[in-house]
Amino acid sequence: MLLAVPSKGRLQEPTLKLLEAVGIRPLASDERALVVPTSWSDVNLIRARPEDIPYLVESGRVWAGITGHDYVVESGSNVAEVLELEFGRGKLVVAVPRSSGITSVEDLPPGARIATKFVNIAYNYFAELGKRVRIIRVTGSVEVLPQLGIADAILDVMATGTTLEVHGLVPIATVLETSARLVVNPQYVEHDLTKKLVTFIKGFYAAQGKKMVFLNVPASRLDAVLAVLPAMEAPSVTKLAKGDVYEVFSVVPEDVLPDLVMKLKEAGARDIVITPIEKLIV
């Protein structure tokens, strides 16, 4: 089945990194190939512009895709956003030149020229406000257009605000908040492949910032060690084959490890081993 991934832009690299982390690795290195087999035998990647992915998924020819919430809203496509991903966050804002003195959308003059690639979002937003504006469709960078006198304002995604600042622009309104989403054709929401992909992505995210800690504990010190060892539910405890010693292991937040290790040693733990967690399926 086909999984659409961004072929360009700010979502491309983090999307491919996420898929690799969950075990979906492209098996072809030729970037000119639009359809690429992967290490998951039931998944092929199809490279597409992020703004086109909602349409591809809606068609049913493509089972799922990763794109921005802003592109989903702009397209108006009938797709299910089954999972919000932890990248691509930003705000779709209206921004004007700092020198304009405009501080709100209400201050925009009648017929103000708004440059954007989010034409549908812009039209609906200003229509709801009852503002008469002229929408200028742009497919590339919009930030320079006010400087050129082509637009009075822009409507675009702001991640950090640095690009706006460089071009002398300031945001005056937030239209919507966005982030990367896993989108699925509605008929595939309950499909086994969708459930598998969602499970592995959630498992990858759940493992972030956590480590697996293994330690050996003499029976006489077991209660003292368990009293200081955090766990998701309860630490796992196994009696070793020799001696009156137990192996204890637990999933632990990484940020508590420095102090925790010292407390465990003081409580009587020894042979402490700390390992990464690739995925945590809950």
From Swiss-Prot:
Reactions this protein catalyses: 1-(5-phospho-beta-D-ribosyl)-ATP + diphosphate = 5-phospho-alpha-D-ribose 1-diphosphate + ATP
Source organism, top-level taxon: Archaea
Keywords from the named record: Amino-acid biosynthesis, ATP-binding, Cytoplasm, Glycosyltransferase, Histidine biosynthesis, Magnesium, Metal-binding, Nucleotide-binding, Transferase
GO cellular component terms listed in the entry, alphabetical order: cytoplasm
Cofactor annotation: Mg(2+)
Enzyme class: transferase
Segments forming a coiled coil: none
Localization in the cell: Cytoplasm
PROSITE patterns membership: ATP_P_PHORIBOSYLTR
Summary of activators and inhibitors of this protein: Feedback inhibited by histidine.
Protein name: ATP phosphoribosyltransferase
Originating organism: Pyrobaculum aerophilum (strain ATCC 51768 / DSM 7523 / JCM 9630 / CIP 104966 / NBRC 100827 / IM2)
